[in-house]
Amino acid sequence: MAKESMKAREVKRAKLVAKYAAKRAQLKAEGNYEALQALPKNASPVRLHNRCKITGRPKGYVRQFGISRIQLREMASNGLIPGVKKASW
């Protein structure tokens, strides 16, 4: 499990990205790169990192479900994800 502070940091970054999204797009369209640099670092969407909603794990993230591969396997095995089952042929 990831530290709570890491999870909170990602949430804070996501809020900051949403707050400055319109201003960032406007400055990019104008070509005003000096003003773009003056924005906070964490306002850039590049600094966001996908994390598992359950554990906060940063690696092995499956976008379709929003969880890590480990949690996906565990939940699918327990039948907690509708329509997902172990493959057999």
UniProtKB/Swiss-Prot annotation:
Its assembly, as annotated, is:
Part of the 30S ribosomal subunit. Contacts proteins S3 and S10.
Keyword field: Ribonucleoprotein, Ribosomal protein, RNA-binding, rRNA-binding
What family is this? Belongs to the universal ribosomal protein uS14 family.
A biological process from GO: translation
Question: What does it do?
Answer: Binds 16S rRNA, required for the assembly of 30S particles and may also be responsible for determining the conformation of the 16S rRNA at the A site.
Q: Determine if Metal-binding is one of this entry's keywords.
A: no
**Any matching Pfam family:** Ribosomal_S14
List the GO terms this entry assigns under cellular component, sorted alphabetically.
cytoplasm; small ribosomal subunit
Give the originating organism: Parabacteroides distasonis (strain ATCC 8503 / DSM 20701 / CIP 104284 / JCM 5825 / NCTC 11152)
Which InterPro entries does this UniProt record tie to the protein? Ribosomal_uS14, Ribosomal_uS14_bac/plastid, Ribosomal_uS14_CS, Ribosomal_uS14_sf
Annotated PANTHER family: 30S RIBOSOMAL PROTEIN S14, SMALL RIBOSOMAL SUBUNIT PROTEIN US14M
Give the organism's phylogenetic lineage.
Answer: Bacteria, Pseudomonadati, Bacteroidota, Bacteroidia, Bacteroidales
One GO molecular-function annotation for this sequence? rRNA binding
Q: By what name is this protein known? A: Small ribosomal subunit protein uS14
